[in-house]
Design a protein with these regions (language model features):
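Outer-membrane beta-barrel signature, preferentially recognizing the C-terminal barrel domain
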Residues: 1-9, 138, 144, 148-197
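Face-selective signature of the C-terminal outer-membrane beta-barrel domain
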Residues: 2-125
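Secondary-structure transition/capping motifs at alpha-helix termini
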Residues: 106-108, 137-142
Length: 197
């Protein structure tokens, strides 16, 4: 289920959004295709997400009209997966709290977006900062040029959907996270040119 709350001023220069959602999965599964009588198990996965976002539109900030976005988000995931026939279990609880910001300056010819997100994941030491930058330039009405950069990460955690793929193929799988794993980092760069006729 989910809930959302939206509030804005009459001119829409200030907007506030708050949201919360949850999902509860309780599943009994058999993976053996009548080949392995021990290939059965249970999964319980409770996922919660909640956040708030505030947006303010400036008629001019420094050099151009802009829109500032500030927000905070919290995610919780509690996973218990048991392969009863093999006497194995994976239990994991994840807490991720994050704050993000971005400001986008925009007019008919240019847009510049600068932003970032700071996350604290309970399975990772320290906070993780993920920046983003996007530039758009329209030298004419028929040409659109864009360039962007975004950083990201993936924490070392077991994912419910990954656990059962190999089991369906007849393999016995036991997932255990190694000590001292660090987050994976990603860097995405893109450039594009569009010509409209």
């Amino acid at each position: 289920g989910s809930l959302a709350f939206d509030l804005s001023t009459a001119d829409r220069s200030d907007r506030l959004n708050a949201y919360a959602s949850f999902q509860n999965t309780a599943r009994k599964s058999y993976y053996g295709s009548h080949q392995d009588p021990a290939a059965y198990g249970t999964t319980h996965d409770l996922t919660l997400a909640a956040g708030v976002q505030y947006v303010h539109a400036f008629s001019r900030l420094l050099f151009m009209p802009s829109e500032l976005t500030l927000g905070a988000e919290y995610n919780y995931d509690d996973l218990a997966d048991r392969s009863l026939g093999y006497h194995t279990r994976t239990e994991q609880t994840v807490h991720v709290g994050g704050f993000y910001f971005q400001n986008e300056w925009k007019n008919r010819r240019w847009s510049l977006l600068l932003g970032g997100r700071l996350d604290k994941h309970n399975l990772v030491k320290g906070a993780i900062f993920s920046p983003r930058v996007n530039v758009r330039f329209n030298p004419s009405e028929s040409v659109n040029l864009r360039a962007s950069y975004a950083g990201g990460y993936r924490a070392p955690q077991a994912f419910d959907e990954d656990m059962h793929i190999a089991i369906v193929g007849g393999e016995r799988v036991r997932i255990r996270l190694a000590e001292g794993l660090r987050e994976e980092r990603s860097h995405s760069v893109s450039c594009s040119a569009d010509l409209y006729r």
